[in-house]
């Protein structure tokens, strides 16, 4: 959408100014979505890959799912926008497990082999609860994303350069 990047940048700049944390102008983002809004983080990453550290879809959907939450077709997906090299984690509870939710993610990985989507079954959990172990796993996922994607020692006053991961080199959470 026209002007969206400028609106996002203004929002982050305003937040940096109001909060006193100037680094908010440039830090990488980890979009998180749950349930029907769990396609949001995939779409954010495709729209702004240089700013996306990692993606978390919690008890939600795959990128470009045919189920609820995806919304209208984003014609730019696959042409000018993708999530190649950005680590993504799709988490489903054991008691909400549904192949119709996983199959679009597997198909996406086949269509976009440079995407780095991993899956986690939240054992013993349903749609609205999360185990402490799952929270620990998400924290580990984010630590590893920082470790492998940050290049050098980023300055607080300039955009962070993120390395693109290659799934052929072993990236799966």
Each language-model region and where it sits:
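Stable alpha-helical elements in mature extracytoplasmic
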Residues: 4-11, 37-40, 104-105, 134, ...
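Alpha/beta-hydrolase active-site loop
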Residues: 2-23, 31
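Alpha/beta-hydrolase-fold serine-hydrolase catalytic core, especially in secreted/extracellular enzymes
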Residues: 113-115, 123-173
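Surface-exposed acidic, glycine-flexible loop patches that form ligand/cofactor-binding
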Residues: 18-24, 77-82
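Short beta-strand immediately N-terminal to the catalytic nucleophile in serine-hydrolase-like folds
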Residues: 31-33, 58
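Soluble non-cytosolic domains of exported or imported proteins
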Residues: 2-6, 35, 99, 129-132
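Short glycine-enriched nucleophile-adjacent loop
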Residues: 38-49
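The feature captures the conserved acid-bearing segment of alpha/beta-hydrolase catalytic domains
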Residues: 53-139
């Amino acid at each position: 959408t026209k002007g969206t990047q400028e609106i996002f940048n203004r929002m982050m700049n305003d937040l940096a100014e109001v909060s006193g944390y100037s680094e908010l102008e440039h830090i990488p983002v980890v979009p998180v979505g749950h349930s029907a809004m769990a396609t949001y983080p995939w779409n954010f990453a495709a729209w702004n890959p240089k700013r996306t550290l990692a993606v978390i879809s919690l008890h939600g959907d795959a990128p470009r799912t045919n189920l609820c939450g995806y919304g209208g077709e984003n014609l730019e997906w696959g042409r000018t926008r993708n999530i190649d090299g950005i680590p993504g984690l799709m988490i489903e509870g054991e008691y909400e497990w549904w192949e119709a939710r996983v199959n679009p993610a597997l198909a996406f990985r086949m269509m976009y082999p440079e995407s780095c989507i991993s899956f986690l079954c939240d054992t013993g959990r349903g749609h609205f609860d999360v185990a402490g172990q799952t929270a620990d796993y998400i924290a580990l996922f984010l630590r590893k994303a920082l470790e492998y994607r940050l290049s050098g020692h980023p300055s607080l006053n300039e955009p962070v350069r993120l390395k693109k991961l290659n799934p052929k080199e072993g990236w799966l959470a």
